[in-house]
Each structure stands twice: as C-alpha cells, then as structure tokens.
Amino acid sequence: MKIQDYTKEMVDEKSFIDMAHTLLEEKGTTMNLYDIIDEFKALGHYEDDEHLENRIVQFYTDLNTDGRFLNVGENNWGLRDWYSVDDIEEKIAPTIQKFDILDEDDEEDKNLKLLGEEEEEIDDQETAEADAEDDDEDLDDPQDEEEINDSDIVIEEDKDEMDEAEQLFEEEEDFNDDPDDDKI
C-alpha cells in the first residue's frame, strides 16, 4: 500500500519509523528529516500538539538506532540498502585533520608558527602597546584634573556625625570606668 493511501487512523496506528521506510522506498531518494515529518503531518492531519511532538521525538530516536536508515549528511536520510559498504564508510567516516609531527629541527625553527601562537603574539603586542601608552601618560595632566572635577564626585566630612561618634565613645568609656575608682 502506498503511503499516500493511508487514512488518518492508519497513520495514528502505524509507527513513524515504518512509515518513513515506506516513504523512502516509494521516493527512491534521500529526504530531509523535516520534509519527512511534514509529510507525516499532512497524512495524519496533525496540528501542533503534544502527542505529535512525542511521536516525532520517538521517530528521531528510532531513525538513529534503526539499522535500515543512514544519515547521509545535512539531516538527509536514506535507506542503508541503497549504499555499498564502501559508500557507507565514505559517507559516515569522520574527517580527520592530519598534522605533521615536529622533530627537533622544527622546534628550533624561529619561522615556524604552531597552532595558537599567532593569537598569543597578537595579544602580547596589544598588551605591550597598552602598557606603553600608560607609561607615556603625564601624571600631572590638567585634563585629569578636569575629569575629576567634572565627575560630580562630592566628598564632604560631616562634623556633626564625627562629634556624635566621639560622644558615644566617651559615654562608653564612662560606663567602662570602675565604680571603685570614683571613691579613691
């Protein structure tokens, strides 16, 4: 039976993974995961609901674990039967960056740049330039005085508060005096 002939009830009863197998067999070509899901939504007359979301999550899990399917890159899925073993290894093999092994002569080479060294050198240069600018700055710069005056920072000493603090201190000393001292 073709997938287009499925009724809503049949779509509800059949698993998405089996429907995906049928769909891919009919199409005969790889399909994007989202296109497969859109096809299922149209067949089942689904609207966005929690039941559909749960089925999609289960479908994606099954798609990754079911040995009949193969991810051929960029979220495109096909049937494993379509590919030879060599093709499968080529499509799913991770890409490995090859690096040359350094020998003692290479390590001593001043012109050789190792990975990440350029970034460190740029950071070091920027730091050195910033330090040089700070060293060149005049400490008696009138512009600094203007900036301080314009910053609206006001520091005032409140003499009343100081007097109250002193009074509290003196009162505490009176409490700490030994009563026997007054009798002497």
UniProtKB/Swiss-Prot annotation:
Domain HTH HARE-type: 14-82
GO CC, one annotated term: DNA-directed RNA polymerase complex
Subunit structure and binding partners: RNAP is composed of a core of 2 alpha, a beta and a beta' subunits. The core is associated with a delta subunit and one of several sigma factors.
Comp. bias (Acidic residues): 117-184
Transcription as UniProt keyword: yes
Chain positions covered by the region annotation Disordered: 114-184
Alphabetical UniProt keywords: DNA-directed RNA polymerase, Nucleotidyltransferase, Transcription, Transferase
HAMAP family per record: RNApol_bact_RpoE
The gene coding this protein: rpoE
GO BP: any one term: DNA-templated transcription
Family statement drawn from the similarity comment of this UniProt entry: Belongs to the RpoE family.
Keyword Nucleotidyltransferase: yes
Physiological role: Participates in both the initiation and recycling phases of transcription. In the presence of the delta subunit, RNAP displays an increased specificity of transcription, a decreased affinity for nucleic acids, and an increased efficiency of RNA synthesis because of enhanced recycling.
GO molecular function, one term: DNA-directed RNA polymerase activity
Protein name: Probable DNA-directed RNA polymerase subunit delta
Lineage of producing organism: Bacteria, Bacillati, Bacillota, Bacilli, Bacillales
